[in-house]
């Protein structure tokens, strides 16, 4: 009997953690347009009904810098791509 109550309590706590993380850990959660500035490119707006940013994502890979500044060879363009070998 005790294990059944413990199991139900564990499921309830797990469910609450999942709901909390979905609501507050999501980067595009917003209460006003200014909250979307850090995760979006212009134009951006906050959907106040759903509290989600409506925008083009501010994707790191779309920036001109495709490498980490601290790494050796940053900004040199990197080595040329290797040719693929074709097998017949």
Curated annotation (Swiss-Prot):
Q: Name one GO cellular component term.
A: extracellular region
Q: Which family does it belong to?
A: Belongs to the DEFL family.
Where found, per UniProt? Secreted
Q: Which cysteines are joined by disulfide bonds?
A: 30-46, 36-53, 40-55
Keywords, in A-Z order: Antimicrobial, Disulfide bond, Fungicide, Plant defense, Secreted, Signal
Organism from which the protein derives: Arabidopsis thaliana (Mouse-ear cress)
Question: What's the protein name?
Answer: Putative defensin-like protein 256
Question: Does the record bear Hydrolase in its keywords?
Answer: no
Q: What is its main location?
A: secreted
Q: Domain of life of the organism in this record?
A: Eukaryota
| An example Gene Ontology biological process | defense response to fungus
What residue stretch is flagged as signal peptide?
1-25
